[in-house]
Amino acid sequence: MKKRASVDSKESEDPPQEDYSLDPLDVDANSKTPPAKPHTFSVSKSRNRLFGKSDLEESSPIDCSFREGEAASCPTITVSSVVTSPRPADGPTSTRQLTQDSIPTSAEKPLKLYDRRSIFDAVAQNNCQDLDSLLPFLQKSKKRLTDTEFKDPETGKTCLLKAMLNLHNGQNDTISLLLDIARQTNSLKEFVNASYTDSYYRGQTALHIAIERRNMVLVTLLVENGADVQAAANGDFFKKTKGRPGFYFGELPLSLAACTNQLAIVKFLLQNSWQPADISARDSVGNTVLHALVEVADNTADNTKFVTSMYNEILILGAKLYPTLKLEELTNKKGFTPLALAASSGKIGVLAYILQREIPEPECRHLSRKFTEWAYGPVHSSLYDLSCIDTCEKNSVLEVIAYSSSETPNRHDMLLVEPLNRLLQDKWDRFVKRIFYFNFFIYCLYMIIFTMAAYYRPVDGLPPYKMKNTVGDYFRVTGEILSVIGGFHFFFRGIQYFLQRRPSVKTLFVDSYSEILFFVQSLFLLASVVLYFSHRKEYVACMVFSLALGWTNMLYYTRGFQQMGIYAVMIEKMILRDLCRFMFVYLVFLFGFSTAVVTLIEDGKNESLSAEPHRWRGPGCRSAKNSYNSLYSTCLELFKFTIGMGDLEFTENYDFKAVFIILLLAYVILTYILLLNMLIALMGETVNKIAQESKNIWKLQRAITILDTEKSFLKCMRKAFRSGKLLQVGYTPDGKDDYRWCFRVDEVNWTTWNTNVGIINEDPGNCEGVKRTLSFSLRSGRVSGRNWKNFALVPLLRDASTRDRHSAQPEEVHLKHFSGSLKPEDAEVFKDSAVPGEK
């Protein structure tokens, strides 16, 4: 690139001669330098030199003379857009616009040009020397590092973001230099908070990058210089989109530090004196930092360990910084708390931690959801907080798990986590069981009435039939009316179910198997009613289909009995998995071989059969004798081969007997021998594979029945049947009484002995002010009003808060951890033991 300079034509005749050298950056490396010639520039001493806009702009040529024999010299060329020189004729000064370069005097140091590429290259290589002249350049050109010409045009990346992405051994010396330059050009806040502007990384700032690079020094430096700790990175890469690469962390710097397991940065962001982060801040979908931690959980052991640890630390730190803030009760835009979000996404490890969290520190004990009532050896009686769990609250954990999609991972296993397992059992034992058995009895009575009404239907004439004044007709009409009323009940119940649950097509036949069958039963019955009053005898066909489905739906009520319920689940799974696949392959074989056989058969070759000039291949085309020249009859005959009742010589009306026999033998081998035996093998494998899964599915089905029964109650009735008891378990941070709706569960833990973990009663088993045997304690798996009468935990709290925690005694034998609920038969071990609490 050639550099040019313009020189004032009205200069003095004897200007000083000076030697100038070209800036090496302005010389083309591929061009050859011609022999230097002596030259002289006439420049005014009072001329001010300023930098121009770009090297690419066209410049006016400079005037120079070359004298042979003088020493060769190269001019130093700098950019100037305005040259001011004194002119006696024009007044005090005369200003002239220059397009490219001006020539400095020998007393001034030449300045270097900078563009985006040169700055990016310098910061990427951690080269501070190349940026020595950046500040004078910006000051003289009145530009800032945040100007558009210094940003990546596609992503909006600045030189600070470029430097953050190019750390050398965890540091880049140009970062502090760039921040100092931005401070001196009055653009520090804008510069340090500049973010990506493209749709993929939109919103990511230097602070996000420093946290992602796990660099505490840079995080501190950025926050000290005014970095926004609430900046949200909401580009496509930071959203949770299925099938697309990315990492969702909650958009905010605090959430990023938490989701990448950086507790030191989390504490710094919350406790720094420059700009503390808001612990309750939400992202674009309403998630707080606790929601973000739940989102990044993946149910692996290492991940669950760090997520639960970070969750606990943030919860405790938030309670200390903001004592009155109920961080765990904040909901996102879907109305989910972190607990409900863990349930809806199948994060069973995080769910179990939140439900069973017990914090022994007195100042943070109000964060506990589990309180140890008493402990005796391995036996623990625990009180579980039912807030956000029971169905009395919106988006409760029980409803979220029971009514979630079948694609939710660990859906069946989550109901086995305490206190959910015991809570559902308590509801079933106290009231749902009786209501369910009553409904079962009513349905059996309904089906008997429906069957009798269908069996004794009139057969003479066309419907509707007139009622005769006989006792039998009165009973028949009454049965028909009751049957139709039941059909309307199942129809509207199905409509209500589909409107409330809105199951997807993919999960419709998995989660809504029974509901679909009841709904189809009602449709057949109502269609039969319409045909009956339309004077059509075809009403009988719809009625018998409804009758058959009605008795089949009796399997729905087997979920009230464990063994029959598990058996019904296995039948359902085999129908939906093995039998559906078998039927698809079998129908393909049946249709294919039927079309081949029916094409081969010709009835006209048999004189006993009437000759038909035009063959109709349909179910209605039958001669006086058996004719297999139709697809319908041939399919029926081939079906007999499937069940082993076929005859290879069921007809003689065909040509090419060898071909006919080969077709039949191939069909028998593929269906009767191969497909049927494969179906039997698959069913046996399915039974072995889903034995335990079927039990969990049965528990889920029973849980859905329990919740449906509760939802059918009025609000006043729900409160009357609510499990647990309202108790004062301590004090809130502001000194008020802390009341919780608690549910008691007796557990056995062979690794944690009688240690002071929170609230422990001195007299184990003495929760009512009266003595009770250990066997009763073991059998009492639920909380009733009688158990909780005149019982409060406030005295225990006051006593526990004044004592220091005792260190756990070393165990003599290291046993494998076991945590579960005591069964009634376990009490036999303690038959001869002294009653706890007695002297």
UniProtKB/Swiss-Prot annotation:
Region (Interaction with calmodulin): 768-802
Keywords on record: ANK repeat, ATP-binding, Calcium, Calcium channel, Calcium transport, Calmodulin-binding, Cell membrane, Cell projection, Glycoprotein, Ion channel, Ion transport, Membrane, Metal-binding, Nucleotide-binding, Phosphoprotein, Postsynaptic cell membrane, Repeat, Sodium, Synapse, Transmembrane, Transmembrane helix, Transport
Predominant place of localization: membrane
Residue spans crossing the bilayer: 434-455, 473-497, 511-532, 536-556, 560-598, 657-683
Residue ranges of the region described as AD: 685-713
Phosphothreonine sites (modified residues): 146, 372, 705
Compositionally biased tracts (Basic and acidic residues): 1-13
GO BP term, example: behavioral response to pain
Alphabetical list of Pfam families matching this protein: Ank, Ank_2, Ion_trans
Start and stop residues of the ANK repeats: 111-139, 154-187, 204-229, 250-277, 286-322, 336-359, 394-416
Binding positions (ATP): 117, 157, 162, 166, 201-204, 212-213
Residues exposed to the Cytoplasmic side: 1-433, 498-510, 557-559, 684-839
Activity: how regulated: Channel activity is activated via the interaction with PIRT and phosphatidylinositol 4,5-bisphosphate (PIP2). Both PIRT and PIP2 are required to activate channel activity. The channel is sensitized by ATP binding. Repeated stimulation with capsaicin gives rise to progressively smaller responses, due to desensitization. This desensitization is triggered by the influx of calcium ions and is inhibited by elevated ATP levels. Ca(2+) and CALM displace ATP from its binding site and trigger a conformation change that leads to a closed, desensitized channel.
Topological relation to the membrane, as annotated: Multi-pass membrane protein
PTM section of the record: Phosphorylation by PKA reverses capsaicin-induced dephosphorylation at multiple sites, probably including Ser-118 as a major phosphorylation site. Phosphorylation by CAMKII seems to regulate binding to vanilloids. Phosphorylated and modulated by PRKCE, PRKCM and probably PRKCZ. Dephosphorylation by calcineurin seems to lead to receptor desensitization and phosphorylation by CAMKII recovers activity.
Residue numbers binding Na(+) 2: 644
GO cellular component term, pick one: GABA-ergic synapse
Chain positions of motif Selectivity filter: 644-647
Note, other: Responses evoked by low pH and heat, and capsaicin can be antagonized by capsazepine.
Functional note: Non-selective calcium permeant cation channel involved in detection of noxious chemical and thermal stimuli. Seems to mediate proton influx and may be involved in intracellular acidosis in nociceptive neurons. Involved in mediation of inflammatory pain and hyperalgesia. Sensitized by a phosphatidylinositol second messenger system activated by receptor tyrosine kinases, which involves PKC isozymes and PCL. Activation by vanilloids, like capsaicin, and temperatures higher than 42 degrees Celsius.
Assembly information from the UniProt record: Homotetramer. Interacts with PIRT. May also form a heteromeric channel with TRPV3. Interacts with CALM, PRKCM and CSK. Interacts with PRKCG and NTRK1, probably by forming a trimeric complex. Interacts with the Scolopendra mutilans RhTx toxin. Interacts with TMEM100. Interacts with PACS2.
Name by which UniProt lists this protein: Transient receptor potential cation channel subfamily V member 1
Lineage of the species this protein comes from: Eukaryota, Metazoa, Chordata, Craniata, Vertebrata
